[in-house]
Amino acid sequence: MSIRKQARLEAKQFIDSLTVQPFPNSQKVYVQGSRADIQVPMREISLADSLVGGSKKAPILEPNEPIRVYDTSGFYTDPNQPVNIYDGLEKVRSGWIEERGDTVLLEQSNSVYTKERLSDETLDELRFDARIQARQAVEGHCVTQLHYARKGIVTPEMEYIAIRENMGRAKYADEELNQQHPGINFGANLPPEITPEFVRKEVAEGRAIIPANINHPESEPMIIGRNFLVKVNANIGNSAVSSSIEEEVEKLVWSIRWGGDTVMDLSTGRNIHETREWIIRNSPVPIGTVPMYQALEKVNGVAENLNWDVFRDTLLEQAEQGVDYFTIHAGVLLRYVPMTAKRVTGIVSRGGSIMAKWCLAHHEESFLYMHFREICEICAQYDISLSLGDGLRPGSVADANDEAQFSELRTLGELTKIAWEYDVQVMIEGPGHVPMHMIKENMDEQLKHCHEAPFYTLGPLTTDIAPGYDHITSGIGAAIIGWYGCAMLCYVTPKEHLGLPNKDDVKVGLITYKLCAHAADLAKGHPGAQVRDNALSKARFEFRWEDQFNLGLDPDTARAYHDETLPQESGKVAHFCSMCGPKFCSMKISQEVRDYAKGLEENGDIAIKLLDNPLEGMQQKSDEFRSRGSELYHPVQEEI
């Protein structure tokens, strides 16, 4: 059997046998909002008690509060919810959409291509059977979250997001858990508590977006903005030479398990329409696309043959399926293309290169730019956010921050204002390849020219010398630009520049980028960001190994690494690991020092005596140590 067939078979087996798989020692909890149908999911990690005194037979224990963390995994980690890939997910937003009374169900598709696919009986075996009936705005109405926000309406989506962003941190009473460094936020507005009204205001001002197509009611509301938690996007999608529908659905479920806040379907191969339907119906997170990729397939890959009619029909097709945000490379102008001639790596964006080629072939501005207002009109009918693509982003550190890149950025700022005229939500895409000392200029220029619309960057990669490790070269830049104010980071996998990522690559990329996003939240001083760190640090100091694993971003890998050298169950309670061994564990020594100092504090006479005659006190402790056999630690089995 070929490698390709084997991969597809394994993916199909994964889908067919998919069962709910909670994280270890975690449970899904739902926090109810002001109404019964606002149920916000979080993952609650239960922790073991702390040993604070007593003896082996009568230990004194102190309970540790469970820790709640942001959860993107949907019903796939909730054992109380049925999961069936062939039926799709529960439509959590349907009631909210319907009660607003500003949408209408479509009797038939507005897309010619959709009609053709539905009438093709040869595609029946590929089709997702439980398709929803698409809807659009009632004529004369706008149905975007930006429109509602500007009218002063706090939607259920906004309340849901406020609860989700707070992660239940108000319930923590432990001062040790709540301690946090102030951070440096470079002008961001980080309130101590996220309220529904704060969410509404940030969306109304254009500083944040809620990607939520009315035809994707399965999505759990989330927000992308500088003044909220830094988000991470995962890319999936087939190509002409690799992957299948089964593999892409598998990658979707895998992506959201490991923290993908949004997922982009970048399919360029066969059956793009059918693949996307399977993905959207099974996704609790927003789905983004680059419509140009599918439009190019419709003209057999010949960029010069692209036109507005084909592209418009593609927008309608994807809008009716439920795509939440479109990447549109409308800022690639004819006059900017010559600016890339002296670059080391030219134009590296697929969408950017397609439009540059079209502009040169027709010697006119792209139809994306010329028809941008019509694009906005379509987005306003379905509440599709625009992700204005950086088609001229640098593809090497040598090309960073050049004239072409920043010229396009200024045009994206102009397009942002046009989109806002239609109450269409906008975020701005950014580089790319940028050395560390040039990253802040990117953030500053974006804030200046794009009116504080959310920034969404691919890394940036800070060096070009590590193929196979670009999740690290880019993670460095991602953490830095997230600190400066970038709202969402597009993950990079180890396969970047080398090939299409598989399931394992997706996980590595996501864990890397969730780490970077969290590091940025800590550096900004985002309220409550340090709670998880504090809980894990406390568990580490107390040798609560299982809690260390479970509080981490990747419990499975942490446990596996520990068990490579200490696989026995006794290793899970040992007061050392294989790094230092039992005789050189700094934390164990620190515990003994702390316990000794505590004893001195409790007995003032001893403390005074030792201070009066320190040499005598040290000799006394030396004699005690030798009399016990000069053993630094008791055997593990004798520990309490």
Curated annotation (Swiss-Prot):
Disulfide bonds: none
Gene Ontology biological process terms from the UniProt entry: thiamine biosynthetic process; thiamine diphosphate biosynthetic process
Domain of life where this protein originates: Bacteria
Pfam family, one: ThiC_Rad_SAM
One GO cellular component, as annotated: cytosol
Pathway connected to this protein: Cofactor biosynthesis; thiamine diphosphate biosynthesis
Entry keyword annotation includes Lipid metabolism: no
Positions of Zn(2+) binding: 433, 497
Record's keyword terms, sorted: 4Fe-4S, Iron, Iron-sulfur, Lyase, Metal-binding, S-adenosyl-L-methionine, Thiamine biosynthesis, Zinc
Gene3D superfamilies reported in the protein's UniProt record: 6.10.250.620, Radical SAM ThiC family, central domain (3.20.20.540)
Keyword hit for Cell cycle: no
Family affiliation: Belongs to the ThiC family.
Subunit structure of this chain's protein: Homodimer.
Functional note: Catalyzes the synthesis of the hydroxymethylpyrimidine phosphate (HMP-P) moiety of thiamine from aminoimidazole ribotide (AIR) in a radical S-adenosyl-L-methionine (SAM)-dependent reaction.
Name by which UniProt lists this protein: Phosphomethylpyrimidine synthase
